[in-house]
Regions:
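Helical scaffold of the NTase/Pol beta-like nucleotidyltransferase catalytic core
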Residues: 1-14, 145
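Metal-dependent nucleotidyltransferase catalytic core
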Residues: 1-6, 34-81
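A short acidic/basic microdomain associated with nuclease active sites
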Residues: 10-17, 70-73
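Amphipathic, interaction-prone secondary-structure segments
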Residues: 18-23, 91-93
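Short glycine-biased active-site loop of nucleotidyltransferases that positions the nucleotide triphosphate
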Residues: 21-27, 82
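Short, solvent-exposed loop/turn and secondary-structure capping segments
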Residues: 25-26, 43-46, 102-103
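Short coil-to-beta-strand
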Residues: 26-35
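Catalytic cores of NTP-dependent nucleotidyl/adenyl transfer enzymes across multiple folds
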Residues: 60, 67-198
Length: 199
């Protein structure tokens, strides 16, 4: 509302992270990319001394207008919103990367570490790639990502293995798998259960 003078809650935002990729489980944070107007980028990128941190504070203050009794703080690249019911949102403020040919599909977002910088992401391409590989693996990619998250959260939470790392590893690993027919052999002998092999 503050940045676009709009009453829409979805016109300039979409899910990213594990929810956007389709690999979230019930313990996952909700990551939301909020697209901000270009003139805001011009303003914050011209600020001397970590304009990225000032941007996160500005987004935090805008959220506090709507949720004044909620725990909201800037954290590196996002604004973290923790509700009393346990729901946790990570808000990523971002700007379209426009070239002389128009928008290239990527976004720049703030990183407040080391004095501040701008990073680039392409979440829609990432989401499409995940959907395509999940489809070609008959749903195995999303199921495997969710299962590894469950095991991580219940047995190895001290390792702090990020969701993007889980997804990237499994995305790459599943690329070399293919399904076997019942009774078909692979070089290591009979496959039980999953009926798949690596190339």
């Amino acid at each position: 509302h503050t940045f676009w003078n709009s009453s829409s809650e979805t016109a300039h935002s979409f899910y990213v992270g594990s929810y956007g990729r389709g690999t979230a489980i019930n313990t996952s944070d909700l990551d939301v990319l909020i697209e901000l107007p270009d003139d805001e980028f011009s303003h914050f990128s011209s600020i001397y001394g970590n304009g990225q941190s000032r941007l996160l504070q500005s987004v935090k203050n805008a959220l506090l207008l709507t949720y004044p009794n909620t725990n909201i703080k800037g954290d590196g690249q996002v604004v973290v919103v923790k509700f009393s019911d346990g729901m946790k949102f990570e808000i990523l403020p971002a700007f379209r990367n426009n070239t002389i040919w128009g928008w290239d599909g990527t976004y720049k977002y703030p990183d407040t570490h080391m004095g501040g910088d701008w990073m680039t992401t392409n979440p829609k391409a990432e989401q499409e790639a995940m959907k395509e590989k999940n489809s070609s693996s008959n749903g195995l990619l999303f199921d495997a990502c969710k299962h590894v998250r469950y095991v991580r959260d219940n047995n190895f939470s001290s390792y702090h293995l990020s969701g993007i790392l889980v997804d990237a590893f499994l995305y790459d690993a599943i690329g070399g798998w293919h399904f076997l027919r019942e009774g078909e052999q692979h070089s290591g002998g009979r496959v039980h259960g999953l009926k798949m092999k690596t190339k």
